[in-house]
Design a protein with these regions (language model features):
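Alpha-helical transmembrane segments
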Residues: 29-74, 278, 282-286, 359-369, ...
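Short helix-loop junctions at transmembrane helix boundaries
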Residues: 271-299, 365-373, 680-714, 723-739
Length: 741
C-alpha cells in the first residue's frame, strides 16, 4: 500500500482530524462501557459464588423410625449424634435490625470437629461470634441493647472470601448443642454448597443473559455509529483515489487502516478509562451491597480480546463499505429500498419467545435446554429486528408525510427520509433500542411488589408489635421474668404471654391460643368477651393472615395446666423500641424462634431473586438511555456534516437557518416517533414473555414512576441532541464555508 495515498486519504484539514478524534472518542466510550459491563457481570457471578455457602441447609438432626407393624406410622424422634465430621447449624431467617436483614448462622460442634466454616475456619465457641466488617461497624455504632447483646462476645471478623460484598451483614455465632436442639430448627452439616442459585439457576442465567444482550447491543450500536463519522467526506476522497488509478483493493485497505488506527487509540484509552472508573463503579449497590473493586476486573486477556475485536470489526466493516462503493460516488449514495421482508427477524424472535413460554406450560416438555436458547435467542432477534424493520416503517411514514406536507421543511425532510430511510433511521436507532430496553426492564421489574404489612386493625397482629414462640420445657416463671424485663424497656407499651396445651412446635399444641382478657386490648382487640380467659385461632400469629380473627370465650376458667407458647411485645413503633424488644426476646433464652413483626414480611418476599435484579434493571435503563443520547448526538452531527454542501447551497439560495433547523428536527422526529410506540409495546410484551417464561406465578403490574421519568429523559436527550447540532448547522452552512466547498 502506497504511504502517499494513505496520507492523501487521511490528512488534509481540521475536519479530518476532528473526524478521527471523534471516532477515537466514541470507540473509547464504547470499549469502556463494554469492559465495565463485562466486569459487572463477572462481579455478580463471583459475588454469588462467595455467598453460596449461606444456602446450605444440611440434613435432619433427628431420626424418625418407622413404627413396628405399621409402615404408615412413625416412632418417636431421636437426635442424630454429633461427630467429628459434622456440626450442628441453625439458620435464623429473620434476624432484623431496622429495615435490614442479617444473615445469621448458629453453630455447635465437638472440640474435635474437622468441619471448616467459610470465612472463619473453626466454629466459634459458645457465647462468641464472628461478624462481617460491615455488621461489626454497625454493632459498634449502635447501643448494645438494640443489637450487640443478641450475639455475645466478639471473636473476630469474617474473611472477605465468604462475603458477597463489603456491605454484607453476616454473623456466625457459637452455641451449645442443647440450645440448638431445643429450638427444633437445627440441622447437621458436613460441608457447604457451592451452588449459589439452587433451583433458580436457570432463571437467574436467563435474566442475566437477556440483560447483558439488552445493554451490550446499544454499546455496539454506538461504536458502529461513531466509526461511520464523516462518511460523505470519506466517500469523496476514496472516489477521487479510485479515479486517479488506485485499485479497489488499495482503497479498501486504506479505509481499513484509516479506521483501525483511531479505533485502536480509542480502544486503548477505553481500557485505561475503564480501569480508572472501576472503583467508582464498584460503589453502585446491587441487592443491598456494593461489589469489591477486584470483582469488576476483567483481566488483561479479556481487555485485549475486546480491543482486538472492536478494532478488527471496525476495520473490516470500513474496508467492506469502501469496496462496495462505486468509482464515481462522491456525496450521496442511493439506498436499496427496504421491503416488507424486514419484518421476518422480529416475527421470528417473537415466535421463539412465545414457544419458550408455551413449553413452560407443558410439564412434559419443560427443560432449560429448550427454554434458555429460545428465550435468549428470541430476545436477541427481537432486538435486531427492531433495528431492521425501522427503515421500512420510516419509509412508509415518510410517504404519508409527503402527501400531507404543507411547508418547504416538511417536503424536503419527507423526501430525504423516503430516499434514505436506512441512514435516517440509523441516527435514532440507538434511542429506539433504548426505549425498547427500558420498557423491557420496567415491565420485568414491575413484578417487584413490596409485601406491605397489613394495616393496624382489630383482630390482626399489630405492625408495631413483635412476637416469638416459646421453646418447649420453659416454665411460666421463666417466661414471666422475660416479659417483666421487656416491660421495663423504653418504648415498650405492653408484654403479653399466650398459653396453649403444648408448645406450638409439638404435635398436640391444639388450634387455639389463650390470653388473659385483661391483656387483649394490648393485642389490638376491641370486642372482648366478658370472661377472664379468651381464645383466638393460632393463625392469628401468622404473618400472612389478612382477615381479622375474633376473640371467643375460652373453654377454661384459668391458665392452670396450660404452658406458655408465645410472647407478644407491643411497642410505640419507633425503630429503637422495636430493636430493643427484639434484642431482649432473642437473647432471653426462652424463645424457640427469633422475634418477628409483620413489618419483616417485606424483607422476606418470595420475589427476592427479581428484587435483587431491580437495581440492575434501573442501571440498565440509565446506561441504555445515556448511550442512546450519545448515539443520536453523533448521528445527527454526522448527518449535518455529510450534507453541509447541500444545506449550504440552500442557504445560498436564500433559505433561512430556521427552515434548515426544522428540516433536521423533522428528520430526527419522524423515524423516532414512527417506531417509538412499537418499541414500548414490544418491550412490555417481551417483559411479560420473560416473566412468565421464568416463573408462571409472576404477574406484571403498572411500571414504577421511574419508567415514565426514563421515557421523559429519553425524549429530552433526543431534543437536546438535535438542538446541539443547530450551532453546527449555522457554522458549516455559512456562505464562506459553502464557497470553500
Amino acid at each position: 500500500m502506497n504511504p502517499g495515498l494513505l496520507k492523501l486519504a487521511v490528512v488534509g484539514s481540521r475536519s479530518a482530524y476532528g473526524r478521527l478524534a471523534g471516532i477515537a472518542g466514541g470507540v473509547a466510550v464504547g470499549v469502556c462501557l463494554l469492559l465495565l459491563l463485562w466486569g459487572g457481570a463477572n462481579g455478580l457471578s463471583a459475588r454469588d459464588d462467595r455467598g453460596a455457602w449461606l444456602r446450605e441447609t444440611g440434613m435432619s438432626s433427628v431420626s424418625v423410625p418407622v413404627a413396628a407393624g405399621d409402615p404408615s406410622a412413625s416412632g418417636p424422634a431421636t437426635p442424630v449424634p454429633l461427630t467429628a465430621d459434622t456440626v450442628l447449624m441453625e439458620t435464623n431467617p429473620v434476624e432484623v435490625f431496622r429495615d435490614q436483614l442479617i444473615n445469621r448462622r448458629n453453630f455447635a460442634a465437638l472440640s474435635t470437629t474437622t468441619v471448616q466454616i467459610p470465612g472463619i475456619g473453626n466454629p466459634p465457641a459458645p457465647g462468641q461470634y464472628y461478624a462481617s466488617p460491615a455488621l461489626q461497624r454497625l454493632i459498634e455504632s449502635t447501643p448494645r441493647d438494640q443489637l450487640g447483646d443478641r450475639f455475645g462476645q466478639f471473636a473476630g471478623t469474617i474473611d472477605d472470601a465468604a462475603l458477597p460484598g463489603p456491605d454484607s451483614l453476616i454473623v456466625i455465632t457459637g452455641a451449645t448443642e442443647s440450645e440448638l436442639r431445643q429450638g427444633g430448627r437445627a440441622s447437621l452439616v458436613s460441608g457447604f454448597t457451592t451452588n449459589p442459585y439452587g433451583g433458580s439457576a436457570a432463571a437467574y442465567s436467563t435474566v442475566l443473559l437477556i440483560g447483558a444482550i439488552a445493554v451490550f447491543f446499544p454499546v455496539l450500536l454506538l461504536i458502529s455509529i461513531v466509526t461511520g463519522l464523516g462518511a460523505a467526506q470519506r466517500r469523496e476522497r476514496f472516489a477521487t483515489l479510485r479515479l486517479i488509478g488506485a485499485s479497489p483493493q488499495t482503497v479498501s485497505r486504506i479505509a481499513a487502516v484509516e479506521t483501525a488506527v483511531p479505533s485502536l487509540i480509542g480502544a486503548i484509552f477505553g481500557v485505561v478509562l475503564a480501569t480508572l472508573l472501576r472503583p467508582a463503579t464498584a460503589q453502585i449497590p446491587v441487592n443491598g451491597t456494593r461489589m469489591f473493586t477486584a470483582d469488576l476486573a476483567t483481566g488483561w486477556l479479556a481487555a485485549a480480546a475486546v480491543v482486538g475485536l472492536v478494532v478488527t470489526a471496525s476495520a473490516l466493516v470500513a474496508g467492506y463499505r469502501t469496496a462496495r462503493a462505486g468509482i464515481g460516488v462522491t456525496r450521496s449514495v442511493h439506498e436499496k429500498t427496504p421491503t416488507v421482508w424486514r419484518i421476518v427477524p422480529l416475527l421470528t424472535g417473537l415466535v421463539a419467545m412465545m414457544m419458550a413460554v408455551g413449553i413452560t406450560r407443558i410439564p412434559q416438555l419443560r427443560s432449560p435446554l429448550l427454554e434458555l436458547p429460545l428465550l435468549v435467542g428470541g430476545f436477541a432477534l427481537i432486538l435486531a429486528g427492531i433495528v431492521v424493520i425501522g427503515p421500512w416503517l420510516t419509509r412508509l411514514t415518510s410517504r404519508i408525510g409527503l402527501r400531507q406536507a404543507r411547508s418547504a421543511a416538511a417536503v424536503i425532510a419527507a423526501s430525504r427520509i423516503q430516499r434514505t430511510p436506512v441512514a435516517t433511521f440509523r441516527s435514532v436507532s440507538g434511542l429506539v433500542v433504548a426505549v425498547f430496553v427500558v420498557s423491557v426492564f420496567a415491565g420485568a421489574s414491575s413484578i417487584i411488589q413490596s409485601t406491605e404489612a397489613p394495616p393496624a386493625r382489630p383482630g390482626l397482629l399489630q405492625p408495631t408489635s413483635l412476637h416469638a414462640t416459646v421453646g418447649a420445657g420453659h416454665t411460666p416463671a421463666q417466661v414471666s421474668e422475660a416479659m417483666r424485663q421487656a416491660k421495663e424497656l423504653p418504648g415498650v407499651r405492653n408484654a403479653t404471654i399466650g398459653y396453649g396445651a403444648a408448645a406450638l412446635s409439638e404435635g398436640n399444641a391444639g388450634p387455639k391460643t389463650y390470653f388473659r382478657a385483661a391483656d387483649a386490648p394490648g393485642l389490638g382487640f376491641e370486642e372482648i368477651p366478658r370472661t377472664e380467659i379468651v381464645a383466638v385461632d393460632s393463625s392469628f400469629l401468622r404473618l400472612w393472615t389478612e382477615q381479622p380473627l375474633p376473640l371467643t370465650p375460652a373453654p377454661v376458667d384459668s391458665l392452670n395446666g396450660l404452658v406458655p407458647v408465645v410472647v407478644v411485645v407491643g411497642t410505640d413503633g419507633t425503630p429503637e423500641a422495636m430493636d430493643r424488644a427484639r434484642t431482649l426476646l432473642n437473647s432471653s433464652g426462652v424463645t424457640a424462634h427469633p422475634a418477628t413483626s409483620s413489618l419483616d414480611n417485606e424483607l422476606q418476599s418470595p420475589t427476592r431473586l427479581v428484587q435483587g435484579l431491580a437495581v440492575l434493571a434501573y442501571l440498565g435503563m440509565f446506561v441504555a438511555i445515556a448511550i442512546a443520547g450519545m448515539s443520536l448526538a453523533v448521528s445527527t452531527a454526522s448527518a449535518v456534516l455529510d450534507r453541509k454542501r447541500v444545506l449550504g447551497l440552500m442557504r445560498l439560495m436564500g433559505m433561512p437557518v430556521s427552515v434548515l433547523r426544522r428540516i433536521i428536527s423533522r428528520e430526527a422526529a419522524v423515524p423516532l416517533l414512527t417506531v417509538l410506540l412499537l418499541s414500548i409495546g414490544l418491550g412490555f410484551f417481551v417483559a411479560w414473555l420473560m416473566v412468565t417464561g421464568i416463573n408462571d406465578t409472576y404477574r406484571m403490574t403498572w411500571p414504577a414512576p421511574d419508567y415514565f421519568a426514563a421515557l421523559a429523559l429519553s425524549l429530552l436527550l433526543a431534543l437536546s441532541a438535535v438542538i446541539a447540532t443547530f450551532s453546527l448547522l449555522r457554522g458549516h452552512t455559512a456562505l464562506a464555508a459553502t464557497r470553500f466547498e
